[in-house]
Amino acid sequence: LGGRKGGMPEMVFEYVLAQKGIDKKDVNINQSIDFGSTAAAFSGGQGDYTIEFEPSATLLEQKGDGYVVASVGTESGYVPYTSYSVKQSYLKMHGATVEKFTKALQKGMDFVQTHTPEEIAEVIAPQFAETELETITAIVRRYYEQDTWKENLIFEEESFDLLQEILEQAGELEKKAPYKTLVTTKYAEEAAAKG
């Protein structure tokens, strides 16, 4: 179960398959189920494998419905799943806000780099009130051991190129965009330097 065509989980999965020498035509990737519903479909008996974000992956394990056998993220390289985008006009008018926001995010990155999975889980637990602390800790530990979190927020050109390569390979990008035109690392670099 890959989620819908054009969704990042499915596109990154196809990219990893290609990197491992597996032609996507040799596997049956079900793209008929919305990504938010794949865990339930898998629990219900659909598919031999599923691609899941957390907490779905850990919950499948805890229910005995599946096992995490590999991390697509570990195999793909640093894919910039989350980024902050603003128009140039906003950046010009509200640069101080972007700077404060970036510094706050960097503080979170610094915290993750200097604390144990147990400490991180305790701090973030109130944001996940419906999830038990033990589950949150298991998820954080998995991400921690996989080196999921970078040390800083700098959106490197290599990651930008990787993202575009994934989109292009999936048939979702007709023309690559120039990194220097679309990305500024000024605020992230300043926040990392002050960290």
Where are these regions (language model features)?
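Residues that form or immediately flank small-molecule/cofactor binding pockets and catalytic motifs
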Residues: 6, 34, 73-74, 184-187
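Short hydrophobic/aromatic-rich motifs at helix boundaries and adjacent loops
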Residues: 10-11, 28-30, 59, 80-81, ...
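Residue-level detector of short coil/turn "hinge" positions at structural boundaries
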Residues: 24, 67, 174-175
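Residue-level detector of family-conserved "landmark" positions at structurally sensitive sites
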Residues: 27, 70-71, 135, 154, ...
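Pocket-lining segment of extracytoplasmic ligand-binding domains
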Residues: 36-129
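Secondary-structure end/capping motifs
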Residues: 92-174
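Conserved C-terminal helix/tail region of periplasmic/extracytoplasmic solute-binding proteins
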Residues: 161-195
